[in-house]
Amino acid sequence: MTKYIFVTGGVLSSLGKGITAASIGTLLKHSGIQVGMLKIDPYINVDPGTMSPLEHGEVFVTKDGAETDLDIGNYERFLDTSYLKSSNFTTGQVYSAVIERERAGGYLGQTIQVIPHIVGEIVKRIKEAGEGHDILIVELGGTVGDIEGLPFMEAIRQMKHDDEVEGTFFVHVTLIPFIKAAGELKSKPTQHSVQELRRIGITPQMIIARSENALPKTFKKKLAMSCDVSSDSVIEALDAASIYDVPISFLRQNILKPISKELSLGELNPNMEKWDSLVKKIVQPQNRIVLGFVGKYLELKEAYKSLTEALIHAGAHLDTRVDIHWVDSEKIEERGAEALLGDCDSVLVAGGFGNRGVEGKIKAIEYARVNKIPYLGICLGMQLTLVEYARNVLGYEGANSIEFDENTPYPMIYLIDNFLDQSGNTQLRTHKSPMGGTLRLGEYPCDTLEGSIIRKAYHGEKTIHERHRHRYEANPTYRKALEDAGMIVTGESNGLIEAVEIKDHPWFLGVQFHPEFTSRLQTPNPSILAFVEATLAISQEE
C-alpha cells in the first residue's frame, strides 16, 4: 500500500511549499524509493488554462496534455520524472465530477453534501494518484484557515484513519519572521498556525521554518516544544542562492530521519553527488553570457518559470551563468531593438497569447537575424519568425498571423481546422471554439531534418518528442517560398511545421513546441542546451 506525506502551509502564501515537497521527493527518489507527486489547488477553476499568467503564473503542460499548476513543473524538474494529469486537481474538477455523477443518477437520490460526497471524491483522487508509488507527496495549495481549503483538510485528516492507507506524515511549512527593531525571531505566527491545524484535527509531525535568519538551537527547541514535534523535526529553510540547493540543505539537517522513522522506511542514504556538483556550478560558474529575454508578462516572472529554470539547467551543465536581460516587447516598439538588445549575446522570444507586444517581438527577431546573433524562438516566437521573414525578406507587405489580423493578405500563421490528438483522434476547432481545452496540448513527435541544428542538438535523433500548447499553426502554403529564400523547415509532425532555421545564420532556431517543459536539472533540454552552448561559443570568439 502507498504511504502519504502531506505538505501544508501556514501564516501566508508563497513560502515554498512546492519546493519543499519537491526537495523531500528528490531525496526520497535518490534513496531508491518510488515517489509520486500531487498538487491540490483549492480554486474553483477547472484548470489554470484560461487564467492570466500575471495572476497565476505559468501554466505547466504535462506529457498527456493537462494544463496544470506550475508546481508540477517543479516536481518534474527536481525528480526528473514526467507526471500525468492525475498529479494535479482543483476544486472545480472535484465539484464537476460530483455534480455530473449526481445528474446521471449515480447517488441514487441522496442529498449531495460536502461530507461525505465532496470529501469522498477528494480522497478517491488522492488514492488514485498514489497508485503504483511507494510514497505519494501531496501538496495542498493555499494556507491553513482558508475557506476554500477546508474540504481538503478534512479529506487528509480522514486519511490518517483509513484502513487502505499504510501510513501518513504531515509537514507544515510556516514563516518565522525576524523583527529588526527588536532583533528577535518570532515563533507566535507558527504556533497559531499549528493551533489552527489542530482545531481541524491534524497535528503536524514536522515544521519547515522559513526564515531570513538562522535559527538558534534554543529557538528550535522552543518551537519544537510549542508545536509538539521532536527537535529533529524542526527543519530550517533559509533563503538559498538557488532553489536546487534546498534538497542539499535539508539533507544536511537529516530531514529523512524523522520521516523514515514514522513511515518505517529503514535507513535512507540518498546519493546526491551529481546534484551537488551541478548546484555548485549554478552558484559559482566559470563563464557568463547575457541573454535578451523578450516577453510580455514581465510583471510576473513566474509566467516564464519553466523557461528561466531551463536556462539555469543548461548553464549548470556548461558551467555558465545565464544572466537574463528582461526586455518588454512593448518597449521595443517604442525604443527599437538595438537600444534594448545591443548588449546581449543572444535573443530568446518566448510564447504568449494576444497581440499586445507582437510588433516588438518581430523587431527583436529581425535584429537577431540581421546581426547574426544566436536566436531561439518558442511557440509564438517561432510563428513570428515566419511573419518577420515574410515581411522583410520575401517582401510580403502586411504578412501576419490571423490571430492578430484576420484580413491579412499573407496569413503565415493560421488556425488549423482539424488535427490528430495524442490518441490519434481527429479534433475539430474554429475561432469560435471555447478557449478552455481547445489547444493542441501535450507531447507529440517531431521528425527532424538531417544536417539541421535541431537534429544535431538532439544528438542525431530522427524523431524527437516535445510538448505543445498552442492554437495556431504555421501555414504550409508559404513553405516553398520561405525555403527558396533561405528559411528551412527542419522539424515536422504529421504535415505540421514544427521547427525552422535560416541557412546563412550561425545559430537560428524557431520551434513550435515548448522545450522548457522537458528540461530538468540533471537532464537539460537539448535545444535549450544547444542554444546556450552556441551563445557561449560565439561570445567567446568575439
Swiss-Prot record:
What family, per the record? Belongs to the CTP synthase family.
Active site residues per record: 379 (nucleophile), 514, 516
Residues annotated to bind L-glutamine: 352, 380-383, 403, 471
Question: What organism is this sequence from?
Answer: Sulfurimonas denitrificans (strain ATCC 33889 / DSM 1251)
Designated name of the protein: CTP synthase
Its GO biological process annotations read: 'de novo' CTP biosynthetic process; pyrimidine nucleobase biosynthetic process
State the superkingdom: Bacteria
Which cysteines pair up through disulfides? They are none
Give residues annotated as binding Mg(2+): 71, 139
Origin organism lineage = Bacteria, Pseudomonadati, Campylobacterota, Epsilonproteobacteria, Campylobacterales
Glutamine amidotransferase type-1 domain ranges (all copies): 290-541
| UniProt xrefs under Pfam families | CTP_synth_N (PF06418), GATase (PF00117)
> What Enzyme Commission number(s) apply to this enzyme?
6.3.4.2
> What job does the chain carry out?
Catalyzes the ATP-dependent amination of UTP to CTP with either L-glutamine or ammonia as the source of nitrogen. Regulates intracellular CTP levels through interactions with the four ribonucleotide triphosphates.
How it assembles, according to the record, is: Homotetramer.
Q: Name one GO cellular component term.
A: cytosol
Q: What CDD domains does the record point to?
A: CTPS_N, GATase1_CTP_Synthase
